[in-house]
Amino acid sequence: MRHIIELKDGWQFTNLDGQTSEVSIPHTWNAIDGQDGGDDYKRGTCTYTLALQKPEFDPDTQEVWIEFDGVNASAQVSLNGQDVCSHDGGYSTFRANLTGLLADENELVVKADNSKNDRVYPQMADFTFYGGIYRMVRLLVVNKAHFALDYLGSSGIRVTATPEGAGAKVRVQSRVTTGDVTVTVIDRKGRVAGTGTGLDTTIEMAKARRWHGVEDPYLYTARCEVTVDGSVTDRLEIPFGVRSFRVDEKHGFILNDEPYDLHGVSRHQDRKGIGNAITREMHDEDMALIREIGATTLRLAHYQHDQYFYDLCDRNGLIVWAEIPYISKHMPNGRANTISQMEELIEQNYNHASIVCWGVSNEITIATKDKQDMLDNHRLLNDMIHQTDPTRFTTLACYAMCGPFNKVAHITDVVSWNLYLGWYVPGLFLNDLWIGFWHLCYPKRLLGYSEYGAEGMPNLHSDHPRRNDHTEEYQAVYHEYMLRCFRRHPWMWANHVWNMFDFAADARDQGGEPGMNHKGLVTFDRKTKKDSFYLYKAWWSSDRFVHICSKRFVDRCGKKTTIKVYSTDDTVTLMVNGKTVGKKTSSDHVFTFTVPLDGDLDVEAFSGLKKDTAHFHKVDKPNPAYKLVKNKNAQKSNWVDN
């Protein structure tokens, strides 16, 4: 059976300046300089060296493999001076067989390279390309008869579950080095639901509970075993869900033959002071916050995420858009890399019930218009996806300035747009016009919003919020409009807020904090939920609550002030300094009260048994700390212009 050894500690890291220090994996060398602005974080080749003791194994019957979950962006691996493997693409798993190269004492060297080049994606994007071995490294000691470890970093097993009536057919395809395969399907209670044998076996289940999104994310397990002469030599357990899905021009996304509203967020994986070298506990925290607002879908941008997080999506019922970092700028020398990254994305994630579509590219027309090579690359990827995985549909995210008639917008099965009308472009009403115009031109071609949002700083506030002021209040006003807008267009297939969390983009200088994109509903450190977070929770979640907005906007001036409240309920009562000042109803979860500002205010908002409180202080003049002070010497705030 498999024996797994994590190679976490004792690595010697040599940076670009030739300085060496001891580090633990996961690790990135850009955790600080990739988040502080200036577009000057260190990019190049750094070296990780590990004194590796040969694990116990029988070379006559066993093999030793090394597995990397993620090295950004290119990796060169050697053992005792001999080349082992190389890999281009910083977000996917890759492995190599070390069996014939191991001595008793070994020197393992990994060169990680995030240098600028013209062949490995991404090279131009609004996020930091952290260099390093930022996901786990392991040794795998396996019997020679095992599930394939050399096929595109995958498990070597594909599970395809097709609903049929009240039951299902479960096809399990296996790649093995040698031996026979036995498959046992087990339900959540550990009961056997079906068995099969062979490299390509189909198991019929008379009854099969559906995986139905956040309402019922029911998972089965395919226990797959390699046997030789009746003895089990390798075993993997693959969770899978039984579900059907499609898109419909009238009702959007359909799950298990029922309309299923896809409203959710996008996610970048990085953290403050940590970069992309995050832990499972951090993944868990992200998922808990996403579930709290009631999201039903998640766009995992702009690259392959950690396998553990896809597992969390399966278990929590989120519908996932998965994509490769073919982004912003088409590179003629990068075609092979787009293909290899897409192949790895599909093979490594094929069994995840949560994933319904593969994203081909993001905003590719920022730097490349509808040129033939770019279009050919997209058609090649689109065709390859359909051939490799006919069970899912394709999509892409178009750049805001990519018009509805651009050819690239009509290659994939469905399309989405990254649109910031009301943020980068004045006029929130333009969203309704744009959506309506698209639907008029292409009534049978499904549209979604893959990105929409506005920057919001929890320390910036205004009585009269306006576009580009970066206040928490304008971000909330923006999202209030967008939620009402999408309600007016129920045929859209999916909409994703950009972003669930603030994230690092070292080329940016906006909001008074260089190196950051502040469009998140939650701050970079995950410690502060902005008002917009509670707005979405009010619209999407069934958890009853009341939230008073602008609590951080403490100092207020004038004769009157506005108190805004979000709640899942349709009625809210407001008390100020112990007296009831109003009771309001709302169909959009937003309740606005205007109250006299005669002095300090102790405010309480009630809905049923739920309550929230806030304190506001009367001042003579606006607090200057609440207003963004723009740095005249700062670089251009729009990263595209840099």
Positions of the model-derived regions?
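Secreted/periplasmic carbohydrate-active enzymes, especially glycoside hydrolases
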Residues: 1-302, 310-312, 316-320, 341-344, ...
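Substrate-binding/catalytic cleft of secreted carbohydrate-active enzymes
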Residues: 171-173, 287-290, 297-539, 543-562, ...
